[in-house]
Every structure is written in C-alpha cells, then in structure tokens.
C-alpha cells in the first residue's frame, strides 16, 4: 500500500487547520516544518520582512524532521503564500530533501486565494514527480466549510 506524508508550514494557523483536517480524514504521516526564524507576527514588519524573505529566496534552518522521504510514494505539501511565493521554510525543505519520483499534491493558502504562482514555483524544485493535484485556498480558517469541501479533492487524488 502506498504511504502518504503531509509536510506543512503554518504561520498564522491557516495551514495548520488544513493539516488537521487532512490528518482526520486520511491515513497519512504529518510533519510540521519549524524554522529557526520568522517575521514578526503582526504589524507592517510581518508583511515587509515576510514578503522580502520570500521574494529574496532566503533560507532558514529547520528543526530536524524524522522523515525519510524515500519511504513515501505520495507527498502533500501545504503552505501559506507570502508575496505571491512560498515561504522560506518550504524552500529550505525542498533544498534539504530532494523530492524526486513522487506523487505530489500542493496546497497553497492566502488572503486572495491566488496561490497558483507559488504552486508553480514548487514544481520547479521537484524532479520527475507526478503532480496529482493542487489547491489554492482563501483564508481557510475564515472559510472553514468551503475549505473542508475543497479538501475532498486531496482524498480523491490518493484514494
């Protein structure tokens, strides 16, 4: 039977909500990315520093994960969108763990619901993966019922 892992980074809790929903629905292992540094949680610095770090392609040091990526056939990667990009924690993960020959589903969430550019950027960092789907969610914690409904497609992709 194919094994599935969900790897996610959450900043304000939206991606954490997505991870919790998927963990309750699917047979998968969940891994949260914890960076050594993050932008301020509020104020203008949140947007300036967070956006700058995403645009600049900054690396962050991640807390060690107990994941052997080669043990999984299916990967779900979930993250918030920062300045139209994926956050530094995702970039660091993709650099540290070479993602190759997997079935991959990518979930991005943002205030606008427009995460396509960030999703496409992830695709440039993986090799020979079969992209089985992607989702761009708008403020999942504020639109819980809508988000839950949209997550059905993730289950179907690996079901």
Residue ranges of predicted features:
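Glycine-rich phosphate/pyrophosphate-binding loop and the adjoining helix
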Residues: 130-159
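P-loop/Walker A phosphate-binding loop and immediately adjacent motor/lid segment at beta-alpha junctions
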Residues: 49, 102-103, 109
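Short beta-alpha junction loops
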Residues: 108-113, 139
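Short, aromatic/basic amphipathic alpha-helical patches
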Residues: 117-127
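Short glycine-rich anion-binding loops that position phosphate/pyrophosphate groups of nucleotides
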Residues: 80-83, 111
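Short, conserved loop/helix-junction motifs that constitute active-site signature segments
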Residues: 69-70, 95-102, 125-127
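Structural beta-sheet core signal
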Residues: 6, 77, 105-108, 133
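N-terminal beta1-alpha1-beta2 submodule of the flavodoxin-like/Rossmannoid cofactor-binding fold
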Residues: 1-77, 84-86, 91, 95, ...
């Amino acid at each position: 039977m194919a094994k599935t892992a969900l790897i996610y980074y959450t900043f304000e809790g939206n991606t954490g909500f997505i991870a919790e929903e998927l963990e309750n629905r699917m047979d998968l292992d969940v891994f949260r990315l914890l960076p050594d540094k993050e932008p301020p949680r509020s104020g203008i610095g949140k947007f300036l520093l967070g956006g700058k770090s995403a645009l600049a392609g900054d690396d962050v040091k991640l807390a060690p994960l107990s994941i052997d990526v080669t043990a999984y056939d299916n990967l779900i990667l979930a993250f918030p969108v920062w300045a139209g990009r994926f956050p530094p924690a995702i970039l660091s993960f993709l650099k540290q763990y070479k993602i190759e020959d997997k079935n991959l589903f990518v979930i991005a969430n943002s205030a606008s619901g427009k995460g396509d550019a960030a999703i496409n950027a992830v695709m440039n960092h993986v090799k020979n993966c079969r992209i089985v789907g992607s989702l761009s969610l708008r403020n999942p914690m504020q639109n819980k019922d809508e988000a839950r409904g949209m997550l059905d497609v993730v289950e179907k992709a690996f079901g």
